[in-house]
Amino acid sequence: EELDKYAKPSVTVDSVIFRYFEERVQTLLIKRKNHPYMGKYALSSGFVQEQEDLNTAVCREVREETSVQLNTDHIEQLVTVGTPYRDPRMWTITIAYLCFMAFNDIQMDKAADDAASTHWLDIAMVNGKLQLTDGDKTLYHDDLAFDHWEILLIAMERIKGRLEYCPTILNIMPEENTLTAYHQLFGTFNETYLKM
């Protein structure tokens, strides 16, 4: 069979990184240093190298862009996205990952490689919509590069859907906590927990 007749996409990985900080759920974004979307917020992401394992690629890209070292026990595949024209430069397929920073895993994030800066943003679902804030600034769909807003939404919905039977988001919490703290954590993804 002639494989040359088939087009070959570039493969990327995107990382949705969560942590628990001052009783809030946060996600780590970068500001892009280069075009396309220069100056926009983005997930830590990059191209998978030839013959590179996907988990290795996720950890490498996050380390290169943010200086954060992920624990491979706390990452999991979220979704594969191949929407046409998602990257204006070329045809790409991305594998997005959920990544959980343990509460006691204190690391200094520092921008490098394709990142101009790093930002821990508060994230929550409010009235059924994604709310993303960087200090006093509220972010909207067009503030994020590529389809990263949609990937964040998918991440929030995935975690919400698994709160009852597989709450991997607990990986970001301190080992000992109160029922109120767990309700607040779960309420970040599903507001009904805040009314209990």
List the model feature ranges, each with a label.
Residues 7, 72, 89, 194-195:
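Short, surface-exposed helix-loop/turn micro-motifs enriched in polar/charged residues
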Residues 173-186:
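Short acidic, hydrophobic short linear motifs in intrinsically disordered regions
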